Amino acid sequence: MVALESAHLVGAGGALGALCRHYLAGAIQRETFPLGTLTVNAFGSFALGLLTFAGVTGDAALLVGVGACGSFTTFSSFSVETVRLWENGYVALAALNAVGNLACALVGIGLAWGIVRIV
C-alpha cells in the first residue's frame, strides 16, 4: 500500500509540474533559441535545490521534488533542441544551449544552497 501511495504523490506532482512546464516554457519559448526550456530547467533546479538543502523528505519530497520538479525540468527536450540547433547549422547556439542549460541549472542549485545556508 505504501508503494501505491507514493506513486499517487509522484503522479500528482508530476501532472502539476508538466502542466506548469508546458505553459511557462510555451509562453517564453523563442523560435531561434529554446529559452523556455532553459528557464524551466534553471528554475526547477533552484526549486529542487531548496527542497533538498532544506531537508524536505517523505511525502513532500515525493510530491514536490520527484513529481513536480522532476516533470517540470526536462533533460530530453533540452537534448533534442540542442541537436536540432546543430542540425540546422546553428552550431554556436547549440553550444550556447548546452553550456547554458548546465550553467543555469548549477547556478540555480548554488543559489538554493546559499539561501538555505543563510536562513
UniProtKB/Swiss-Prot annotation:
UniProt keyword annotations, A-Z: Cell membrane, Ion channel, Ion transport, Membrane, Metal-binding, Sodium, Transmembrane, Transmembrane helix, Transport
InterPro entries reported in the protein's UniProt record: FluC
Keyword Transmembrane helix appears in the UniProt entry: yes
Catalysis: reaction(s): fluoride(in) = fluoride(out)
Chief location category: membrane
Gene Ontology terms for molecular function: fluoride channel activity; metal ion binding
Any single biological process term in GO: cellular detoxification of fluoride
Positions of Na(+) binding: G70, T73
Activity control mechanisms: Na(+) is not transported, but it plays an essential structural role and its presence is essential for fluoride channel function.
Segments crossing the lipid bilayer: 46-66, 96-116
Compartments where located: Cell membrane
Membrane topology qualifier: Multi-pass membrane protein
Family, as annotated: Belongs to the fluoride channel Fluc/FEX (TC 1.A.43) family.
NCBIfam families the record matches: crcB
Role played: Fluoride-specific ion channel. Important for reducing fluoride concentration in the cell, thus reducing its toxicity.
HAMAP family per the UniProt record, alphabetical: FluC
Protein name from the UniProt record: Fluoride-specific ion channel FluC 2
Species annotation: Haloarcula marismortui (strain ATCC 43049 / DSM 3752 / JCM 8966 / VKM B-1809) (Halobacterium marismortui)
Gene this protein is translated from: fluC2
